[in-house]
Amino acid sequence: MALNLRKNHQILKIINNALIDLPAPSNISTWWNFGSLLGICLITQIVTGLLLAMHYTADTNLAFSSVAHMCRDVQFGWLIRNLHANGASFFFICIYLHIGRGLYYGSYLNKETWNVGVILLLALMATAFVGYVLPWGQMSFWGATVITNLFSAIPYIGQTLVEWAWGGFSVDNPTLTRFFALHFLLPFVIVGLTLVHLTFLHETGSNNPLGIPSDCDKIPFHPYYTIKDILGFALMLSLLVSLALFSPNLLGDPENFTPANPLVTPPHIKPEWYFLFAYAILRSIPNKLGGVLALAASILVLFLTPLLHTSKLRSMTFRPLSQILFWTLVANVLILTWVGSQPVEHPFIIIGQLASLSYFTIILILFPLAAALENKLLKL
């Protein structure tokens, strides 16, 4: 009998074990679709980004014009750019929903998978930040200036570090050149980390909505979840294409249609919407170093979630108190996102401070306390 190539070929069998014959829980919901959607986002961003890089010029005198030239003179350049810019938004929507799913269903107890995932989030944020600088509009320039300047808050080495990152005494041509190099490199780092993320995931297998072992009831990934994933791809790509075709600038800042000018500061410097929650936390502390530490902590706190898990149950499915806290946290992050887009004045300052405090309180104090209380109430 001939050997099955799919199961015996050195390379094909890796793909087979990851995407075809992979044993998957029979009851995973649509919340488990976001991993594959993130994969599609990554592929879309790399393909569109590569096509854009072919026409882009990383020079302060030419960057803005080269982007305009792309949109006017390159075949479908406008579409490629709009897909790339809005693809980043979809990437972040998917990753935030993916992390939310992980928090709700206790997926963070796969510690290695979770930790690599948090590193992936940091890599994605770095990629998006350096990418936003490349069109060299007003918000690109001032966003780069403000955010890189935060490193100067690091005691003793801060100022030196910032000037080293800038390649001079301000954000200028060397900064743009290196940001382009980093923006080209980082997605491939993300691809590598994604493979590590999947390798760790396939050691344990997927979690499921009940948070219980599902070894006794597995189904093959193909055809069941391949079909389910393709439905997800179709829905997400149709939303992305609709946004890119009907309202491509909806999520952008109008300030970025003005070429970068170091002599004119925009009235409200703010990052893209997906960083606003962290930006609000940064702004809510009236001290530079304190703000930077809070900004870092807002993401790095995710590393602590496996250590703060006090419940005897893995998932929140049967934990109503934790559910209430979880959705309060979601609402809180949305409030932070809104506050981050508002000017620094009353009442936004105090709202931002309260929301920042709530953010850390819920994650670090209330989640573990609620879980311990639920153990008692459920006599576990």
From Swiss-Prot:
Main subcellular location: mitochondrion
Molecular function per GO: metal ion binding; ubiquinol-cytochrome-c reductase activity
Listed Pfam families: Cytochrom_B_C (PF00032), Cytochrome_B (PF00033)
Cross-referenced SUPFAM superfamilies: a domain/subunit of cytochrome bc1 complex (Ubiquinol-cytochrome c reductase) (SSF81648), Transmembrane di-heme cytochromes (SSF81342)
Residues that coordinate or bind heme b b562: H84, H183
Subunit structure: The cytochrome bc1 complex contains 11 subunits: 3 respiratory subunits (MT-CYB, CYC1 and UQCRFS1), 2 core proteins (UQCRC1 and UQCRC2) and 6 low-molecular weight proteins (UQCRH/QCR6, UQCRB/QCR7, UQCRQ/QCR8, UQCR10/QCR9, UQCR11/QCR10 and a cleavage product of UQCRFS1). This cytochrome bc1 complex then forms a dimer.
Name of the protein: Cytochrome b
Native source species: Setophaga americana
Gene label: MT-CYB
